[in-house]
UniProtKB/Swiss-Prot annotation:
Name of the molecule in the record: Protein cueball
Similarity field: Belongs to the cueball family.
Gene name of the encoded protein: cue
Membrane topology, as annotated: Single-pass type I membrane protein
Species assigned in the record: Drosophila ananassae
EGF-like domain: residues covered: 363-397, 398-429, 432-470
Length: 643
């Protein structure tokens, strides 16, 4: 018996749903008149269902249990039905959720996954009903809001599951409004009642905390409006014509709506095209005087974005829903995290099995738990994986940041969406756009700035100029040179002179060469000429002489002076006969015969400078003597001849 257990476990594991066969394979669902059409993210049809119905209209989606709820206006017994998309089933069985009670006409559907309640508007009875899907289908629904006495006409409905609010549109053309109320029926508030005509479908964007609704304007025009959840900061997302939109759906970055006229689904970016009106109501925020304050702001148009036709349908398009990844995206949201935990806890409780488990059942449970990868939670009753932030896929096997950023680093945002931080020189949602891509023309080289704020610049090749090297100087100059041939007085840019000369060599009949006055002045002079070199050398020499003079003067200024010695000698002009015994004391010469010699400091003393006679002996012995020896002998002879 034990031999069959592993085999049975292996067979059961092989029969588990594969990753490509789970309900996560579709991203959009659209109700046509006689069927529901499922489409993927590229708007390719995957499958169709609910072919047994004849007049489908509104629909809503329970993403927690993968259930679609829709309305059929002509069914005899039921009014609202549920359908589960099963990729392995040959057909999709729709079950009755709400029994028909009369001649009702459902305008809009909404679902609350926390309390498991359905909300819908009845355009004939002018009421908003709700009912629990856990109650028997035969149990009559309850009235949440009765608008019959006011003459209002409720159309679209939407549930804010995080803040526990219900929003609806009133398309009564005499007094159209957008209103909200708590899901328990209290605190009704009008959030918009001006500058609207006939609001239709409405949806709450939990990611941006904003409302979006369709307004069927007068004539052939329509608009998609947006505001905060309290009605403030109203904006016109788009305005166009020749559409008859009914319902809309949202993704992270786009709006989708169904058009009955063109039988198609259209899309537009979610950002606003014009900021319209900001309204703050007293119920939300009171002013100082306690009255309603309304401020009009000037329209601020942004870049126009055309509408995109994403899907052509075979029948009249009506309701539409989109998969938003609610449980993954809002796990960290301040308003939604507690609601997500409560819903997940309820799903876990529903998945618990109370019967006695065998060995095979326990092993099957282990296989089911291992079915979801990367920490995903497996909901066995619905065969569904709830993935943690950063992972997606039917088994949470795909990391959202894997290969997401082309030239950058990927991180998960607070809303569990991948976000790219680009490298310098790259931009785009996935850093896929280079700032230099296609910037420089004609072979120019792109240079990035030193900082992220600096714009890239182009280094242009010869004969090209401009911020993007888009100006071809050869072509421009050729036009001037051709025109100069016929109009000689025209001014030709200076840079065209050489180009015109080159063009004239090949086509001298049509090309004229401009003649500029004082052309040599405009040319770049040669700096190192002979005159410049001479002036430079002379300047250096004079500079050196000046420095030498200054240094010598400083030395003479600070050098001490030598003492000046002055001595006077008296001698005869002519020697006497027999004068060997004469001395200056015994025989002093007379005044007429004497001669005085003054010697200063012994430095200006020389035989040639002596005004008296020159002894013969000195002439003979000092003929070839040096200056110093000459001075010594002169002093010696003078001492001998003193009187």
């Amino acid at each position: 018996m034990m031999i069959w257990v592993p085999a049975l476990i292996f067979l059961s594991a092989c029969l588990l749903p594969r990753s490509n066969g789970t309900p996560l394979e579709w991203d959009f669902a659209v109700t046509l008149r006689t069927k529901i059409q499922f489409l993927d993210s590229s708007w390719q049809t995957i499958a169709t269902a609910a072919h047994e119905f004849d007049e489908l209209s509104a629909l809503t989606f329970d993403e927690s249990e993968e259930l679609i709820y829709f309305n059929d206006r002509q069914h005899q017994n039921g009014s609202i039905f549920s359908l589960r998309r099963d990729a392995y089933a040959a057909s999709h069985v729709a079950q009755q959720a709400i029994q028909r009670t009369g001649n009702e006409s459902v305008g809009g559907l909404a679902y609350d996954p926390l309390n498991r309640n359905l909300f819908w508007s009845d355009t004939l009875q002018r009421k908003i009903f709700f009912a629990s899907i856990d109650s028997p289908p035969s149990q009559p629904p309850k009235v949440l809001v009765d608008l019959s006495q006011e003459g209002a006409r409720p159309e679209g409905v939407a549930v804010d599951i995080c803040r526990r609010k219900l929003y609806w549109t009133n398309s009564n053309i005499t007094h159209p409004t957008v209103e909200r109320i708590d899901v328990d029926g209290s605190n009704r508030v009008i959030i918009a009642d001006s500058d609207i005509d006939m609001p239709k479908g409405i949806v709450v964007d939990q990611l941006s905390d904003r409302l979006f609704w369709i307004d069927d304007l007068k004539g052939v025009f329509f608009a998609v409006m947006s505001s905060n959840l309290d009605g403030s900061d109203r904006q016109v997302v788009l305005k166009d014509k020749h559409h008859e939109p009914q319902n809309l759906a949202l993704t992270n970055d786009a709006i989708f709506w169904t058009d009955r006229t063109t039988k198609a689904v259209w899309s537009h970016p979610k950002r606003a095209a014009v900021k319209a009106t900001t309204t703050v109501r007293p119920e939300v925020e009171s002013s100082t005087d306690g009255t309603e304050s309304e401020s009009k702001q000037e329209s601020e148009p942004v870049e126009d974005c055309p509408l995109v036709r994403v899907a052509n349908l075979s029948e009249e398009a009506r309701g539409i829903v989109a998969r938003t990844g609610f449980y993954q995206r809002l796990q960290k949201d301040a308003h939604c995290s507690s609601i997500v935990r409560k819903i997940k806890l309820r799903l876990d409780e529903m998945s618990e099995k109370k019967e006695v488990r065998s060995l095979v059942d326990e092993r099957m449970d282990q296989l089911e738990r291992d079915h979801c990868m990367n920490g995903g939670s497996y909901i066995s009753k619905r065969d569904l994986c709830i993935c943690p932030a950063g992972f997606k896929g039917s088994r949470c096997e795909i990391r959202e940041c894997h290969n997401y950023c082309v030239h950058g680093t990927c991180q998960m945002s607070d809303l569990a969406y991948p976000k790219c931080y680009c490298q310098p020189g790259f931009t785009g949602e996935r850093c896929e756009v280079s700032n230099c891509a296609g910037l420089c023309l004609n072979g120019g080289h792109c240079r990035l700035g030193e900082t992220e704020k600096d714009q890239p610049s182009c280094e242009c090749p010869a004969n090209f100029a401009g911020e993007r090297c888009e100006q071809n100087s050869t072509q421009i100059c050729s036009l001037f040179c051709r025109l100069l041939k016929h109009e000689p007085e025209i001014h030709v840019p200076f840079g065209c002179h050489d180009i015109c000369e080159e063009l004239a060599l090949d086509n001298s009949t049509n090309i004229a060469i401009p003649q500029y006055q004082h052309l040599e002045v405009c040319q770049t002079p040669f700096v190192w000429t002979s005159s410049v070199i001479i002036i430079l050398v002379v300047g250096i020499v004079f500079s050196l002489l000046l420095i030498t003079t200054i240094i010598h003067g400083i030395r003479r200024l600070y050098k001490p002076k030598r003492p000046r010695i002055r001595k006077t000698f008296v001698v005869r002009k002519q020697p006497r006969t027999n004068s060997a015994g004469d001395t200056p004391l015994t025989n002093r010469p007379m005044t007429a015969e004497q001669c005085e010699i003054t010697i200063e400091n012994c430095c200006n003393m020389n035989i040639c400078e002596t005004p008296c006679f020159d002894p013969k002996l000195v002439e003979q012995t000092l003929a070839k003597s040096s200056c110093k020896e000459d001075k010594k002998i002169l002093i010696h002879n003078m001492e001998d001849d003193l009187y």
